[in-house]
Amino acid sequence: MNNLPVVRSPWRIAILVIGFTFLYAPMLMLVIYSFNSSKLVTVWAGWSTRWYSELFHDDAMMSAVGLSLTIAALAATMACVLGTIAALVMVRFGRFRGSNGFAFMITAPLVMPDVITGLALLLLFVALAHAIGWPADRGMLTIWLAHVTFCTAYVAVVISSRMRELDRSIEEAAMDLGATPLKVFFIITLPMIMPAVISGWLLAFTLSLDDLVIASFVSGPGATTLPMLVFSSVRMGVNPEINALASIILGVVGIVGFIAWYLMARAEKQRVRDIQRARRG
């Protein structure tokens, strides 16, 4: 099949440049102003790494960063486990009584406003505390449970879309050779959906790290996440330390994202080569 000719248009290039400018110019300005020596974030006074130094000596900021990263990592991991199970049920179990309701309940958090989700979870935790005495206090645990609730929906959608594209003949061949369903899943299915699992984990991690509304409802005294601290700081005036912290997060996320993309692309190419080699053999 002949490749379609690529039509290059100045208008298309201009629109592309404008789009990327709107996306990445604010990030570039953020990184530049993180090296501003002035306390006023909008007034340039020269290059300095002062705010990076003060950032690491700010106990409240470091505590919020540690709490947010811990919750995000744990929530993303649990969301991947639950999301994989949910995707397996939706894709592999076919039609069963209540399948539509199950799929709706899994994906409902995708279209639910954060305010409604946060309020509903708050009422749930308060009711449980009155009924069984748990949770005794709202804090890291309640935030983690809330983040797992809505992150699982995103992970399930990502993994289920990948599972629908898989060639089931490989799994069926393994079962014909005597492999148990559990062994087939861990040896064949899981490696093939691993790029989607990694993508889902990164997406869930980002969503959890970025959440403000839901965490504000279900958090308690002493459990202040990074978005909550940043939002409260911005209301009283933008702290230059926030620019430094945001620049570090951008750099880390960019590096991790590139590494994940590279590893997934290499794994996908290797998987395609292995399948082609197996079919030829």
In which residue ranges do the predicted regions lie?
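Loop-to-helix entry region at the N-terminal start of transmembrane alpha-helices
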Residues: 20, 63-70, 124-152, 196, ...
